[in-house]
Amino acid sequence: MSEFEYPQGYGLIAGVDEVGRGPLVGAVVTAAVILDPNNPISGLADSKKLSEKKRLVLAAEIKEKALAWSLGRAEAEEIDELNILHATMLAMRRAVKSLKILPHLVLVDGNRVPELDMPAQAIIKGDGKVAEISAASILAKVARDQEMETLDKQFPQYEFAKHKGYPTKVHLEKLMRFGALPQHRRSFAPVRKAIEEFNRTQ
């Protein structure tokens, strides 16, 4: 974790991150975390750079040691209705509002912040710089991956556990072969094209 200079004059700081903007299926999942400065967690990093095993271990530790944590989400229908950017902002707002303690400042990964009731700051590549954002990225990633495992059990023919809903060659082939599920994001071009191809071959 690189040295990050926290803005001065704030008490409780929450980190917020999202997982699942790119996949073709399921919700975009966000997390908000307020860490306890007196109970540090070692090994926090961008969730994408950690093994699944390490993420699971850290997620349990974050939930145990954080002053507060919560998840937010926007479903595929909301993504289709609002677009992925606005749905992500909505999911971030939901995560922050669900915190049992309200933070004085929110640090958000990326270059945009949602409308919140407290000051917020966007930090580009924040999941590799800010411990709170790293913790949020880990919780969101673990939660979304578990949702894909569940979906995989319900619809094994799509192999969601392997590709986690991302637009891989395998996923696109399955979409064209079996059609789209209610959980698929119909506003995403690859899903639309796959539905057209599926309908054409029926």
Curated annotation (Swiss-Prot):
Keywords: Cytoplasm, Endonuclease, Hydrolase, Manganese, Metal-binding, Nuclease. Manganese or magnesium. Binds 1 divalent metal ion per monomer in the absence of substrate. May bind a second metal ion after substrate binding. A divalent metal cation binds at residues 17-18, 109. One of its GO terms (biological process) is DNA replication, removal of RNA primer. CDD domains: RNase_HII_bacteria_HII_like (cd07182). One of its GO terms (cellular component) is cytoplasm. It is found in: Cytoplasm. Belongs to the RNase HII family. Its EC number is 3.1.26.4. Endonuclease that specifically degrades the RNA of RNA-DNA hybrids. Its cofactor is Mn(2+); Mg(2+). Transmembrane segments: none annotated. This is Ribonuclease HII. GO terms for molecular function: manganese ion binding; RNA binding; RNA-DNA hybrid ribonuclease activity. Its main location: cytoplasm. Pfam families: RNase_HII. Residues 11-200 form the RNase H type-2 domain. It comes from Actinobacillus succinogenes (strain ATCC 55618 / DSM 22257 / CCUG 43843 / 130Z). It catalyses: Endonucleolytic cleavage to 5'-phosphomonoester.
